[in-house]
Regions:
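Short acidic/polar micro-motifs centered on Gly/Asp/Asn
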Residues: 5, 33-35, 110
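Alpha-helical scaffold segments in carbohydrate-active enzymes
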Residues: 12-15, 59, 118
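Short, low-complexity N-terminal intrinsically disordered segments enriched in polar/charged residues
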Residues: 1-31
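A structural signal for alpha-helical segments
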Residues: 1-4, 45-48, 107
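A solvent-exposed, acidic/Ser-Thr-rich amphipathic alpha-helical stretch
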Residues: 25-96
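A beta-strand edge to alpha-helix "cap/lid" segment located at domain peripheries
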Residues: 66-161
Length: 161
């Protein structure tokens, strides 16, 4: 793996976080145009369409009108990237922690877990082919989610019909 490949894959990880935190669901979903997006939960669903990913996030994520954002900071850490021998595909496992801080809600971690990603290089550009979100730790999601989510809830983001 050369340093350019490593940088371009890491950049995709960071763009996901940045776009979510900006409330740019269409921009975030576009990163997965050629990917299978697997949601967390007891019955995970695979979403393979950017419009469906946008709908899913809009159905579950609270956006604050005065900022147009969810008031979050997604932090990706410890990415371990493995490049295939031919240099045309890669996998990555990383940690994700989401912090939220808004006017009446002190800054705190609200959810954490792992992302399991796959990538391919097409025409010299890296792109996602799969993202699997594995949620492992839950904090106070009351200011972040529009629907019940987490241990004991009946809901986890499912693919829209």
């Amino acid at each position: 793996m050369n340093s350019t490949d490593l940088y371009e894959i890491q950049k995709l990880l960071y763009l996901y976080c940045e776009r979510l935190d900006q409330g740019d669901f269409p921009g975030m979903a576009e990163l997965f145009r050629h990917a299978r997006f697997v949601t967390p939960g007891d019955a995970p669903a695979a979403v393979c369409d950017p419009a469906a990913i946008v709908e899913m996030y809009r159905n579950y994520t609270r956006i604050y009108p005065h900022t147009g954002t969810p008031g979050t900071k997604h932090v990706v850490a410890n990415p371990i990237i493995d490049l295939a021998a031919d240099g045309m595909s890669a996998s990555c496992r990383s940690y994700i922690v989401v912090f939220q801080g808004i006017e009446d809600f002190a800054l705190q971690p609200i959810i954490a877990g792992r992302n399991l990603d796959r990538f391919e290089k097409v025409d010299g550009q890296w792109r996602y082919t799969e993202r699997q979100i594995c949620t492992e730790h839950y904090g106070d999601l009351s200011r972040h989610m529009l629907r019940e989510f987490g241990p004991g809830s009946a809901a986890a983001p499912a693919a829209p019909k």
